[in-house]
């Protein structure tokens, strides 16, 4: 009787600008504190596409072939000798950032700021758009039975929204402005509502994206065309009847950041989530004299347990974010679809035996 064929580890690998390939990698062996995962669902992020198109994001440069993907969930296939809280068959969501050392940022609970952190699909670290992947077990979180694999993968972008709303201090009764109706804008909207925001207004250039934001839960939407930042701020105030206490800027566009400063209530907070140009011109004096606090966001920290609780309790519904699904074998087609700006969140299905959500 012929031996069963050994499974292959099909992986999506970027080699440099414009050079994206599907290749078979060796199946990794987990270390003592790691687990081997059979990947199930992995979302495509704008950073994945940027590494494909440009070969770099800022100082993070693709210098050797790198597996893409960091919005992920899967099933435990094998556990390391020291792993006690997980077992084969457990369904897990993966937090992609794992501290390499217990530095000052880890000690203060802000491990996302550690300069030596491992992060999936950030050069030189491989991601998890593949069939099999090993990860630190402490950063793999069991999914409740009522949370799907796709929801587990979406915890990564949801975590950005949680971290942004925490940084902004969103609480009961707040009016919140979200600039940008892409995936991060939409999760920021959902989290703001879950944290008690009374009204959330979302702005964007795209009418279809605003329609989706409205469908998902935005109280008000504003399509931007050729207005000045001051005019946009005036329209936001007109819609809400007052200036928002918190603005979450998810585009990184200079004009949108300017509008965010003008729009935010005196004494309020502007949270910068979107990454744009390194040098940006903003009306800083306008923020200073009105005590508008400007806070940055870099990824997230300490968000996965909260996100899982929100999903399990149905406090947020992120399922409508997924608009396209592709098997891993069609990853190149999926990336082209993303590049064309079609849909909201594209999900790649990595397990050939289970293509369900």
Curated annotation (Swiss-Prot):
GO terms assigned for molecular function: D-xylulose reductase activity; L-iditol 2-dehydrogenase (NAD+) activity; zinc ion binding
Membrane topology recorded in Swiss-Prot or TrEMBL: Peripheral membrane protein
Location of Phosphoserine modifications: 211, 225
Keywords from the UniProt entry: Acetylation, Cell projection, Cilium, Flagellum, Membrane, Metal-binding, Mitochondrion, NAD, Oxidoreductase, Phosphoprotein, Zinc
Sequence positions that bind substrate: 51, 156, 299-300
Subcellular location(s) per record: Mitochondrion membrane; Cell projection, Cilium, Flagellum
UniProt GO BP: flagellated sperm motility; sorbitol catabolic process
Record's keyword annotation contains Acetylation: yes
Taxonomic superkingdom: Eukaryota
Cofactor(s) of this protein: Zn(2+)
Details of cofactor binding: Binds 1 zinc ion per subunit.
Keyword Acyltransferase included in the entry's annotation: no
Positions of NAD(+) binding: 184, 204, 209, 273-275, 297-299
Residues that bear N-acetylalanine: 2
InterPro entries cross-referenced by the UniProt entry: ADH-like_C, ADH-like_N, ADH_Zn_CS, GroES-like_sf, NAD(P)-bd_dom_sf, PKS_ER, SDH-like
Catalytic activity: xylitol + NAD(+) = D-xylulose + NADH + H(+); L-iditol + NAD(+) = keto-L-sorbose + NADH + H(+); keto-D-fructose + NADH + H(+) = D-sorbitol + NAD(+)
Listed Gene3D superfamilies: Medium-chain alcohol dehydrogenases, catalytic domain, NAD(P)-binding Rossmann-like Domain
GO cellular component terms, semicolon-separated: mitochondrial membrane; motile cilium
Record family assignment: Belongs to the zinc-containing alcohol dehydrogenase family.
Function: Polyol dehydrogenase that catalyzes the reversible NAD(+)-dependent oxidation of various sugar alcohols. Is active with xylitol, L-iditol and D-sorbitol (D-glucitol) as substrates, leading to the C2-oxidized products D-xylulose, L-sorbose and D-fructose, respectively. Is a key enzyme in the polyol pathway that interconverts glucose and fructose via sorbitol, which constitutes an important alternate route for glucose metabolism. May play a role in sperm motility by using sorbitol as an alternative energy source for sperm motility.
Name of protein: Sorbitol dehydrogenase
Chain's gene name: SORD
């Amino acid at each position: 009787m012929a031996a069963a064929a050994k499974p292959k580890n099909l992986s999506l690998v970027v080699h440099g600008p414009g050079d994206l390939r599907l290749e078979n990698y060796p199946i990794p062996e987990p270390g003592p504190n790691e687990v081997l995962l059979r990947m199930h669902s992995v979302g495509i992020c704008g950073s994945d596409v940027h590494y494909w198109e440009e070969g770099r994001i800022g100082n993070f440069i693709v210098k050797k072939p790198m597996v893409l993907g960091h919005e992920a969930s899967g099933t435990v296939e094998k556990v390391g000798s020291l792993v006690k809280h997980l077992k084969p068959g457990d369904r897990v969501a993966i937090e992609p950032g794992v501290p390499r050392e217990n530095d000052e940022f880890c000690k203060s609970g802000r491990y996302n700021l550690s300069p030596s952190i491992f992060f999936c699909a950030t050069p030189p670290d491989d991601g998890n758009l593949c069939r099999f992947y090993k990860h630190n077990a402490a950063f793999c979180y069991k999914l409740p039975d009522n949370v799907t694999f796709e929801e587990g993968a979406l915890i990564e972008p949801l975590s950005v929204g949680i971290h942004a709303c925490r940084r902004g201090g969103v609480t009961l009764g707040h009016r919140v402005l979200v600039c940008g109706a892409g995936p991060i804008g939409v999760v920021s909207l959902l989290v703001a509502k879950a944290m008690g925001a009374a009204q959330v207004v979302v702005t964007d250039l795209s009418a279809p994206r605003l329609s989706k934001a409205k469908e998902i839960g935005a109280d008000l939407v504003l399509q931007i065309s050729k207005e000045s930042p001051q005019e946009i701020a005036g329209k936001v105030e007109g819609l809400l009847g007052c200036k928002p206490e918190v603005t979450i800027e998810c585009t990184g566009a200079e004009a949108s950041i300017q509008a965010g400063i003008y729009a935010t209530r005196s004494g309020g907070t502007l949270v910068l989530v979107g990454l744009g140009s390194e040098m940006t011109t903003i009306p800083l004096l306008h923020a200073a004299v009105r005590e508008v606090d400007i806070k940055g966001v870099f990824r997230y920290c300490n968000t996965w347990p909260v996100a899982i609780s929100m999903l399990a309790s149905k406090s947020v519904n992120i399922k409508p974010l997924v608009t396209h699904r592709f098997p891993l074998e069609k990853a190149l087609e999926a990336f082209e679809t993303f590049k064309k700006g079609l849909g909201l969140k594209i999900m790649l299905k990595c397990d050939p035996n289970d293509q369900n959500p």
